[in-house]
From Swiss-Prot:
Residues 144-173 are annotated as: Disordered. This is Alpha-crystallin A chain. Zn(2+) 2 binds at residue 107. The modification Deamidated asparagine is found at residues 101, 123. Glycans are attached at residue 162. The modification Phosphoserine is found at residues 45, 122. SUPFAM superfamilies: HSP20-like chaperones. Residues 1-63 are annotated as: Required for complex formation with BFSP1 and BFSP2. InterPro entries: A-crystallin/Hsp20_dom (IPR002068), Alpha-crystallin/HSP_16 (IPR055269), Alpha-crystallin/sHSP_animal (IPR001436), Alpha-crystallin_N (IPR003090), HSP20-like_chaperone (IPR008978). It comes from Artibeus jamaicensis (Jamaican fruit-eating bat).
Amino acid sequence: MDITIQHPWFKRALGPFYPSRLFDQFFGEGLFEYDLLPFLSSTISPYYRQSLFRTVLDSGISEVRSDRDKFVIFLDVKHFSPEDLTVKVQEDFVEIHGKHNERQDDHGYISREFHRRYRLPSNVDQSALSCSLSADGMLTFSGPKLQSGVDGGHSERAIPVSREEKPSSAPSS
């Protein structure tokens, strides 16, 4: 069986049965006009694709930063409260889990759950890790790095999520 593989630049919209946001995390938040009529963009040009109106950090996608002095993870969890979130460090990984039971929203009843796992750099000071949730729903997990390549120590422990009253200062990409 021959399968044709196309470069993404030459991909055309596949019609209303294959919406372009199939794997995005906007479940239960309504649709944009181009979600309902994706074939219109391909009639203009096969290479044209409308951009999303939301920023990367507003779409549930995380941002990981690691520089000389610290390691930081930004994650949009606006649908979860601190009580719904669990943050654990196991060995070289941080695991962030969020779950809330079924509740009513504007569109009916909904329940949400996610699980993210990130590898920590070996020189992160695991005893000084912190996690906070801003007023606009941005989870910030951070920890300082140790100097001169010292190993940060490995153990399993839970990191409490504290609530901040101000919106996040995370830059939108």
